[in-house]
From Swiss-Prot:
The protein undergoes a dramatic conformational switch from closed to open states upon substrate-binding, which enables specific substrate recognition for the 1''-O-linkage. The glutamate flap (Glu-47) blocks substrate entrance to Mg(2+) in the unliganded closed state. In presence of substrate, Glu-47 is ejected from the active site: this closed-to-open transition significantly widens the substrate-binding channel and precisely positions the scissile 1''-O-linkage for cleavage while securing tightly 2'- and 3'-hydroxyls of ADP-ribose. Signal peptide: none annotated. Binds 2 magnesium ions per subunit. GO terms for cellular component: cytoplasm; mitochondrial matrix; mitochondrion; nuclear body; nucleus; site of DNA damage. This is ADP-ribosylhydrolase ARH3. It is found in: Nucleus; Cytoplasm; Chromosome; Mitochondrion matrix.
Length: 370
């Protein structure tokens, strides 16, 4: 193993499987949703920028820090969340209301959230789905998504960006996979869309356990995805798009190869893994950001902790910055816990208090009662 990968493995072990003590602790639950929110709010500033300079991101996040000895945030203007957080919250609210996954309730909450607050940056495709779901004549909540793109369904990252709550509510791998898929299929019917949501949910699931090494983390993800992507629908969907067989598995292998290199440019990461709105161009990228940033980064000051470093690095890759950062933030937050969520960043982001209440409620309903 190269120096970089060995250092990442050491970082995981040194953190004791994460800085948040016990597996599935309340600190990890809170850190997960907080990390997702911070990634969305901080990343949204740069969304759709093809290239983002690291210096610009560092300047942006440094503006959140107060002067030494001054509490709170230095910002006077709030950083607003996007559809990523709006959908994440709707998913969690449905899980809490039903104390289980309920596709009808969740679909209606997604659609009602859009209707109530449509200016959060929703894509045109998913708006069509929501409008159909709002029609009282809609009898099958999965049908609008299946009809997308001439019946092929969407392979965007919208199912993955909001999925963290599934990993918090369900503790078994089987349940995480099942309900990540079902929740994603409400808007993303292509296997290339919902398999991305499953991969993201599994990454959060493993982070909540505090997996002991980056190598083991990747091995487990790869084992699950190779099995999932072997099914007939996944093979067909990849073939129809002219992609390699098992696109997620192949990208996870690339993640491992990049981690084995001591120095990797951000341009190479984007070239190899992507930074786009397709789930296969963003979920593996978010996982790479989390694993790469377990160790110090030469261009990111050591005054930033591992969670902050993950978000800064994610955003510096450009492209779909808010979604890649929200996914990387959910994984990192689940791993490091609430201890690494800086108060100044919390106070800069819209909706932090509500998000924190949702995380604590999830822990009480699904973890403490189990």
């Amino acid at each position: 193993m190269a120096v970089a990968a060995a250092a990442a493995a050491t970082a995981m072990s040194a953190a004791g499987g994460g800085g948040a003590s016990a597996a599935r602790s309340i600190s990890r639950f809170r850190g997960c949703l907080a990390g997702a929110l911070l990634g969305d709010c901080v990343g949204a500033v740069y969304e759709a920028h093809d290239t983002v300079s690291l210096a610009s991101v560092l300047s942006h996040v440094e503006s959140l820090e107060p002067d030494p000895g001054t509490p709170g945030s230095a910002r006077t203007e709030t950083l607003y969340y996007t559809d990523d957080t709006a959908m994440t919250r709707a998913l969690v609210q449905s899980l809490l209301a039903k104390e289980a996954f309920d596709e009808v309730d969740m679909a209606h909450r997604f659609a009602q959230e859009y209707k109530k607050d449509p200016d959060r940056g929703y894509g045109a495709g998913v708006i069509t789905v929501f409008k159909k779901l709002l029609n009282p004549k809609c009898r099958d909540v999965y049908e609008p998504a299946r009809a997308q793109f001439n019946g092929k369904g969407s392979y965007g990252n919208g199912g993955a960006m909001r999925v963290a709550g599934i990993s918090l509510a369900y503790s078994s791998v089987q349940d995480v996979q099942k309900f990540a898929r079902l929740s994603a299929q409400l808007t993303h019917a292509s296997s290339l869309g919902y398999n991305g949501a499953i991969l993201q949910a599994l990454a959060v699931h493993l982070a909540l356990q505090g997996v002991s090494s980056s190598e083991h983390f990747l091995e487990q993800l790869l084992g699950h995805m190779e099995e999932l992507e072997g099914d007939a629908q996944s093979v067909l969907d990849a073939k129809e798009l002219g992609m390699e067989e098992r696109p997620y598995s192949s990208r996870l292998k690339k993640v491992g190869e990049l981690l084995d290199q001591d120095v990797v440019s951000r341009e190479e990461v984007v070239s190899e893994l992507g930074n786009g709105i397709a789930a296969f161009e963003s979920v593996p990228t978010a996982i790479y950001c989390f694993l790469r940033c377990m160790e110090p980064h030469p261009e990111i000051p050591s005054t930033f902790n591992s969670l902050q470093r993950t978000l800064i690095y994610s955003i510096s890759l450009g492209g779909d910055t808010d979604t890649i950062a929200t996914m990387a933030g959910a994984i990192a937050g689940a791993y490091y816990g609430m201890e690494q969520v800086p108060e100044s960043w919390q106070q800069s982001c819209e909706g932090f208090e509500e998000t924190d209440v949702l995380a604590q409620s999830l822990h009480r309903v699904f973890q403490e009662s189990s």
